[in-house]
Regions:
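Hydrophobic alpha-helical membrane-insertion segments
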Residues: 30-37, 165-182, 329-338
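Transmembrane-helix bundle segments that line or gate the permeation/cavity pathway
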Residues: 41-60, 129-238, 255
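Membrane-interface segments at the starts/ends of alpha-helical transmembrane spans
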Residues: 14-19, 110-125, 198-210, 243, ...
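N-terminal signal-anchor module of multipass membrane proteins
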Residues: 2-51, 114-120
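Alpha-helical transmembrane segments and their immediate interhelical/interface regions
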Residues: 120-152, 284-306
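Cytosolic juxtamembrane amphipathic/interface segments immediately preceding
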Residues: 7-19, 153-157, 238-245, 313-316
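Low-complexity, proline/glycine-enriched hydrophobic segments characteristic of transmembrane helices
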Residues: 42-120
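Long, contiguous internal "core" modules enriched in hydrophobic/ aromatic residues
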Residues: 25, 84-93, 98-107, 208-210, ...
Length: 341
């Protein structure tokens, strides 16, 4: 089937980095590592300085102007003395709020201390891994939905999104590493039970055990489907016939349904739960739109780069118009979801 459209040279075409590009990539990796180390050093050296200086300035201000402290206390007592006794409901509301958010009014786990430099570094790693996961999942959905729709135009470029979702096993390793420092990132873990009424109502879902189990299931199925679709795709090109196509069609149809459920829950677990007090009923769709827009942008850049390097000469302007249209369409769709929130 595919062999009638592609020459044997095109079917076995493989991209290889030139020495110049390889040196650039290694150089950028080295610069990235250096910047990470510099950022960690600066974050470490800057921990607590802002809070301490603020406290010292406040103490000096009160020492130099003791009347300020007295007047402030008098105003506080006037504002909450008779009024608070006259309105018991208001007093009970304040008391309940203080109990829900800790004695300091900012939550038991994050009221007194800001994020440490270690937390900043781990959070940067966490967000970077999330970014590449969204691109890989957008590429995987792109392949699956076009297989279900029996679209023929994407055959010329499908090796690129297949390479993009090849990142998923590495992303899974990063996700497993993230399990080790969940208690430094997620507020619903940091705040002890009983100190935040709203978070307590969500602990049946937001708990470390459920989070880890769902994540393992999601990544396991995603990686399995990605490997199966990739293997069937190469067999279809080399062996021809409809057997591998029909197998990939069935797998893709089931995956599209699983993707809609799993990716929405993944977005809630890994992104939305970072702000457990915030509500959104369309966050799964919003994340999906962003994934597809990012994946299409990455696909466009890679295809144009490969064509300039002399690869994929069979990709014509019609193909370019199609995936550029996808990029524009999902960018508009993402913007609409963003405004809707």
């Amino acid at each position: 089937m595919a062999s009638s459209h592609f020459t044997p040279e095109q079917l076995t075409e493989r991209f290889e980095l030139s020495s110049r590009i390889r040196n650039i990539v290694y150089g950028l990796v080295g610069v990235g590592v250096i910047l990470v180390l510099i950022g960690a050093f600066l974050a470490q050296s800057g921990d607590g300085h802002h809070d301490d200086s603020h406290g010292e300035e406040h103490a000096e201000l009160i020492t130099e102007n003791p009347t300020i402290h007295t007047v402030a206390n008098d105003q506080h007592e006037d504002g909450h003395g008779e009024d608070s006794h006259a309105d018991e409901d208001h007093g009970h509301a304040d008391s309940a709020h203080s109990e829900a958010h800790g004695d300091d009014g900012h939550g038991g786990g994050h009221g007194h201390h800001g994020p440490t430099w270690v937390t900043r570094v781990l959070t940067g790693f966490y967000m970077s891994n999330l970014y590449f996961i969204t691109i890989a999942m957008g590429a995987l959905f792109f392949i699956a939905v076009h297989r279900v729709g029996n679209a023929g135009w994407q055959t010329a470029i499908r090796r690129v999104p297949e390479a993009m979702f090849g990142w998923l096993p590495f992303a899974a390793v990063g996700a497993l590493a993230s399990f080790l420092f969940m208690d430094q990132i997620f507020e619903w873990i940091i705040i002890p039970e009983g100190q935040d009424a709203l978070i307590d109502t969500k602990r049946a879902y937001l708990n470390p055990t459920g989070f880890i189990i769902r994540s393992i299931i999601f990544f396991g199925v995603w990686i399995l489907v990605a490997r199966m679709l990739r293997r069937l795709s190469t067999r279809e090109d080399t062996l021809g016939g409809l057997q591998n196509f029909e197998k990939s069609l069935g797998i893709s149809a089931g995956f599209v349904v699983f993707f809609a459920i799993s990716y929405s829950l993944f977005a809630i677990d890994w992104i939305k739960s970072l702000e457990p007090h915030w509500f959104s009923t369309i966050f799964g769709v919003y994340t999906f739109a962003g994934s597809m827009a990012s994946a299409m942008a990455t696909l466009t850049i890679l295809v144009y780069f490969l064509r300039r390097q002399g690869y994929m000469k069979y990709v014509n302007d019609s193909h370019a118009q199609d995936f550029n249209t996808y990029m524009l369409g999902f960018s508009i769709f993402w913007a609409y979801m963003w405004v809707s929130q």
